[in-house]
Amino acid sequence: YVTSSSSSQRFNEGSWGPYYNPDNYYAAGYQGINDINAFLEYSVGYKDKLAVKRDTLTLDGKRKYEEDVLQVERFIAEAHALRAYYHFELAKRYGAIPIITEKTKDAAAARKPRQSFDEVAQFIAEETAGVMGGLVSSWTDVSMPTQSGRVTQNVARAIKARALLYAASPLHNPANDPAKWIAAALAYAEIINTNKFSLYKDYRSLFLDGVSAEKEKEIIWAVRFSAGNSMERKNYPIGTAGGNTGVCPTHDLFLAHGHKTV
């Protein structure tokens, strides 16, 4: 049993549609892209902007200026990778989509022709490959473990690899072109060959006690969160405090597993 307003029940009933789509990412995705494009547009000439009305001559002043320049350069590289990520999430849901690389002031300005999934995947591959030099290998490598969750080189590689894998799948590759599978395999090999990843020894503690170099071996892209039990409470049965029966397996999923008649 589940509440009638929950997303899973909407899917079960077939009551979702263009006016209620629990996975409606279109507006949010393009808003994110537009925000990134605005940042990239504003960041042009960032070195000169950072030098305005500040000391860049003394040793200490020059050091602080160079630190700020490095930080902005990282932000720019991360922004390009995130723009690729947003395009992937949109294409994953909607297939052919417009590729937007300039800030738009209104919806009419964003009405561009859709481009095929292959074209989007190629854009993602080029967008991520072009900023690898500006991304850190990991945040612990640069003594900034608290920044875990921001984009790294392997995050960018993973975005590219997944886009190429989807492009090779039967949905977007009905002719089963082997070149697309090879491109996806090579993209994943870039991650594997870094030899940075392995399973962490204690899965439970992976989510506790902060970030460490050892834990990062299992994590390509971390999601930051604050400790709490709201997710578990939402899984409680209806009738308990805060319960929403959040876990709603379908009947087909139930039948796919062994069960015993009581």
Indicate residue ranges for each PLM-predicted region.
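Extracellular structured ligand-interaction cores
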Residues: 35, 74-76, 81, 96, ...
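Short, solvent-exposed turn/loop segments enriched in Gly/Ser/Thr/Pro and often Arg
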Residues: 1, 98, 139, 148-151
